[in-house]
A protein has these predicted regions:
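Helix N-cap/capping motif at the beta->alpha junctions
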Residues: 36-49, 72
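Receiver (REC) domain active-site loop signature in two-component systems and cognate sites
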Residues: 67
């Protein structure tokens, strides 16, 4: 019997970090669909095009903070303005290579952001994300 893992969207301007995240997610959650975006605006467009989420009940967004054009907090601001119907199909986990405490404090102010993790992603972080994504 296989576990039905959620889908993932990885948003990171680093192609290498996107690749690493995809590999870790794919090996940890073998039947999960993983989409990567190096531009946060493109990821937001994808969410808007989906309207009611993916075919699965939940999509987990792994969101980098420091990106050009639209950073993680800009993305979160735009996401917070979406309809509740759209937002209900997603949970956001931010990732960063920064040790800036103000990022953690700021992330806590967004209802859609569940937690802020330090890079790099690991299998244990992905499993923790999955376990906490289905609880409020």
């Amino acid at each position: 019997m296989s576990i039905n893992y959620p889908d993932f969207i990885v948003v990171d301007d680093s192609r290498l970090d996107c690749f690493i995240s995809q590999k870790i997610i794919s090996t940890t959650c073998q039947n999960a669909t993983v989409q990567s975006f190096i531009n946060a605006a493109d990821a937001l467009d994808e969410i808007l095009n989906r309207q009611n989420g993916s075919a699965k009940d939940l999509t987990i967004i792994i969101l980098d903070i420091q990106m050009p054009v639209m950073n993680g907090f800009d993305f979160a601001d735009a996401f917070e303005n979406l309809s509740e119907i759209i937002k209900s199909g997603y949970v956001i986990y931010m990732v960063t290579s920064s040790t800036n405490e103000s990022d953690l404090i700021r992330a806590r102010n967004y209802p859609s952001i569940r937690f802020l993790y330090n890079k790099p992603l690991t299998k244990s972080i992905i499993l923790e994300i999955i376990n906490t994504s289905y609880t409020n």
